[in-house]
């Protein structure tokens, strides 16, 4: 005699041949003559490593009679599919569920789902509305782009718990606009796999409530023409705007020029030079308190870096990308205060995954935040109205990439 669900092998059946879009409600309707233990929570779909339904599921029932009733449903149809029903037990169910799907034994149940079929231009706010009532963690929405900076139509969403992620799967085949959205189980590991070159995660619209500060930035290639530094959108320039932008940049010899080749080094007190081995680039910090990282794993994400410095909370993370579109293994991390930047240095030579990380401090007490003043901008030939400017985030010479976030006709900052 089988023991009850609280103390033994339970009353479990296995279904095979389920439609790919099968929902918990579909299973409940199929077994409407049976009592399912714990209701919807008693239905357990089996997933592939890619997070897709495998067409099989375990169902916990209330009694031995319910098992017998379920077995009578063998070869009955659900939609156009014939469903096979087998007797099973809790040990088999637990083992299979533990070793299948992206959240298997070697992956944490971290609350991720993957969306597919998003409409062009879909925003993070629309995704939040799509999952209305389900808590998404801060910075929990990732929109991958292809090597040309175009949205792939997919997204990863991390919920506050695995239970919420399971509920999110119930939104499968619901609509955003006129598009049907597919929702699959996912994992941190799958998200990281998308960060392999040449694919990168980059924000492609104004920052929303689920973005960390500083994540809305664009990557801009730099090309020198006719005595001025001309910034044109590169493959990763996917922020809005779409117009060519011009900005004064370091010429690589320690001199900084404006649009017309004039020396501006006297006014850029917030800028500092990095020379770490063969790496040479110029970055403007928004706080003046920066730690440079070297030796990052190529799969490292911004979240990995935030976690690396935990419990400290960086203000901004900038992962360097080289001219070939690949990560360089280096990054700049800004902190709110000099004291926090110094505290972060305690992580020097600590490991991230299998790599030990070198840290370099670039912060002094009372460092400037690097904002341009109205007087300086007017000295560049910019009108007083246009001189309300602050926030040129990063300019890279050797890496041929900068990280600014701007609107149309701007010079690297907000309109």
Swiss-Prot record:
Residues with site note (Interaction with RNA): 16, 20, 52, 75, 116, 120, 150, 173, 294, 298, 326, 349
GO biological process: mRNA processing; regulation of RNA splicing; RNA splicing
Residues modified as N6-acetyllysine: 200, 224
Leader sequence segment: none
Residue span, RRM domain: 13-85, 111-188, 289-366
Residues recorded with modification N-acetylmethionine: 1-2
Superkingdom: Eukaryota
Quaternary structure, from the entry: Identified in the spliceosome C complex. Interacts with AGO1, AGO2, TBP and TXNL4/DIM1.
Free-text domain note: The N-terminal RRM domains are responsible for recognizing the G-tract of BCL-X RNA.
PANTHER family for the chain: HETEROGENEOUS NUCLEAR RIBONUCLEOPROTEIN-RELATED (PTHR13976)
The name this protein goes by in its record: Heterogeneous nuclear ribonucleoprotein F
Native species: Macaca fascicularis (Crab-eating macaque)
């Amino acid at each position: 005699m089988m023991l009850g669900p609280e103390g033994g092998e339970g009353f479990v059946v296995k279904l095979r041949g389920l439609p790919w879009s099968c929902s918990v409600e579909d299973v409940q309707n199929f077994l409407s003559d049976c009592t399912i233990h714990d209701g919807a929570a008693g239905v357990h779909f089996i997933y592939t490593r890619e997070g897709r339904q495998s067409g099989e599921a375990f169902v916990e029932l209330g009694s031995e009679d319910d098992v017998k009733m379920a077995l009578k449903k063998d070869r009955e149809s659900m939609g156009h599919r014939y469903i096979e029903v087998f007797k099973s037990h809790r040990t088999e169910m637990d083992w299979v569920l533990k070793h299948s799907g992206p959240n298997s034994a070697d992956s944490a149940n971290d609350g991720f789902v993957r969306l597919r079929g998003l409409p062009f231009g879909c925003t993070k706010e629309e995704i939040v509305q799509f999952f209305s009532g389900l808590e998404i963690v801060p910075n929990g929405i990732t929109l991958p782009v292809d090597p040309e900076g175009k949205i792939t139509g997919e997204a990863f969403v991390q919920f506050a718990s695995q239970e919420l992620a399971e509920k999110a799967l119930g939104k499968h085949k619901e609509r955003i606009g006129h598009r049907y959205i597919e929702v699959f189980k996912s994992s941190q590991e799958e998200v990281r796999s998308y960060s392999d070159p040449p694919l990168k995660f980059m924000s492609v619209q104004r920052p929303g409530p689920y973005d960390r500060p500083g994540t809305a930035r664009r990557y801009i290639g730099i090309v020198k023409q006719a005595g001025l530094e001309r910034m044109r959108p590169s493959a990763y320039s996917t922020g809005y705007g779409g117009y060519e932008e011009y900005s004064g940049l370091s010429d690589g010899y320690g001199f900084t020029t404006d649009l017309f080749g004039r020396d501006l080094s006297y006014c850029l007190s917030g800028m500092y030079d990095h020379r770490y081995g063969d790496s040479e680039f110029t970055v403007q910090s928004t706080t003046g308190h920066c730690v440079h990282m070297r030796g990052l794993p190529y799969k490292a994400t911004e979240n990995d870096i935030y976690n690396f410095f935990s419990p400290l909370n960086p203000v901004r993370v900038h992962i360097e990308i080289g001219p070939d579109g690949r990560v360089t293994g280096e990054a700049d991390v800004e902190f709110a205060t000099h004291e926090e930047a110094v505290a972060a240095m305690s992580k020097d030579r600590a490991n991230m995954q299998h790599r030990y990380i070198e840290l370099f401090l670039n912060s002094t007490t009372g460092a400037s935040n690097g904002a341009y003043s109205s007087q300086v901008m007017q000295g560049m030939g910019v009108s007083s109205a246009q001189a309300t400017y602050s926030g040129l985030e990063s300019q890279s010479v050797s890496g041929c990439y900068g990280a600014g976030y701007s609107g149309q006709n701007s010079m690297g900052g907000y309109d």
